[in-house]
Amino acid sequence: MNIFDRKINFDALLKFSHITPSTQQHLKKVYASFALCMFVAAAGAYVHVVTRFIQAGLLSALGALALMICLMATPHSHETEQKRLGLLAGFAFLTGVGLGPALELCIAINPSILPTAFMGTAMIFTCFSLSALYARRRSYLFLGGILMSAMSLMFVSSLGNLFFGSIWLFQANLYMGLLVMCGFVLFDTQLIIEKAEHGDKDYIWHCIDLFLDFVTLFRKLMLILAFNEKDKKKEKK
């Protein structure tokens, strides 16, 4: 039999038999909210970079933090769903605004960095998300302690670099941060599944976990590509 004549069963590829139907419905809501966040964040970034009506700064950062705290303080229920979705959209918008300075830096160096970084982030996020969804349940939850330890190490090294001013340490933190965020995609995806299996159906808050993973991945990859492009230009000179 010719292997090229075989039909691919896409239903089997998208079948997650180890995840209950109610949790699968929950995940659909999570990823639908995630898609909404992506569109709203893109609008926020556009407002900063193009219209300059709202600029990234201390106020936008405090606004995003305030919206997140309000979202956390508002209990998940059918009555508060619309309000919490509005808070989520506001948080995503201000997060997009906060990406503005990094976007402007990349545009100044080479505008092609932006689509490359976005496509790269989308591919990384999709691959690691699918890996977590197809893997045996709880198989990546052990990463939690390792990832938090790595985050603590990065935080300490970043504080130390304020005094040393080492570009090498800064770049090492970027690469390490990229690796750590890949781990967080695995960890957060499986943690969302476990929470849903145990009755936690707050898809709006679960969406924030994945949204922040994606944004941080995008920021890290964008800056890595920007610094690499800058180094190439220096070598040509």
Swiss-Prot record:
Positions on the Cytoplasmic side per record topology? 1-29, 74-86, 134-139, 188-206, 228-237
List the expressing tissues: Highly abundant in adult testis.
Q: How is it modified after translation?
A: Ubiquitinated by BFAR, leading to proteasomal degradation.
Keywords assigned: Apoptosis, Autophagy, Calcium, Endoplasmic reticulum, Isopeptide bond, Membrane, Transmembrane, Transmembrane helix, Ubl conjugation, Unfolded protein response
* UniProt topology in membrane: Multi-pass membrane protein
Signal sequence coordinates:
none
Q: Which GO terms describe its molecular function?
A: calcium channel activity; endoribonuclease inhibitor activity; enzyme binding; ubiquitin protein ligase binding
- Cell wall biogenesis/degradation: is it a keyword of this entry? no
Q: Where are the transmembrane segments?
A: 30-50, 53-73, 87-107, 113-133, 140-160, 167-187
Set out the biological process GO terms recorded for this chain's protein: autophagy; cellular response to unfolded protein; endoplasmic reticulum calcium ion homeostasis; intrinsic apoptotic signaling pathway in response to endoplasmic reticulum stress; lung development; negative regulation of apoptotic process; negative regulation of apoptotic signaling pathway; negative regulation of calcium ion transport into cytosol
Gene Ontology, cellular component aspect: cytoplasm; endoplasmic reticulum; endoplasmic reticulum membrane
According to the UniProt entry, the cross-link of type Glycyl lysine isopeptide (Lys-Gly) (interchain with G-Cter in ubiquitin) is at K7
Report the main location listed first in the record.
Answer: endoplasmic reticulum
| Compartments it resides in | Endoplasmic reticulum membrane
Q: Which residues are on the Lumenal side of the membrane?
A: 51-52, 108-112, 161-166
Intramembrane stretches, per the record, are: 207-227
Q: Which Pfam families match?
A: Bax1-I
Comment on protein domains: The intra-membrane loop at the C-terminus acts as a calcium pore, mediating calcium leak from the ER into the cytosol.
Similarity remark: Belongs to the BI1 family.
Q: Function, please?
A: Endoplasmic reticulum (ER)-resident protein that confers cellular protection as an anti-apoptotic protein by limiting multiple stress-inducing pathways surrounding the endoplasmic reticulum and mitochondria. Inhibits the activities of the key sensor for the endoplasmic reticulum unfolded protein response IRE1alpha/ERN1 both directly and by blocking BAX/BAK binding. Modulates ER calcium homeostasis by acting as a calcium-leak channel. Negatively regulates autophagy and autophagosome formation, especially during periods of nutrient deprivation, and reduces cell survival during starvation.
State the oligomer form and interacting partners.
Answer: Interacts with BCL2 and BCL2L1. Interacts with ERN1.
Name of the protein: Bax inhibitor 1
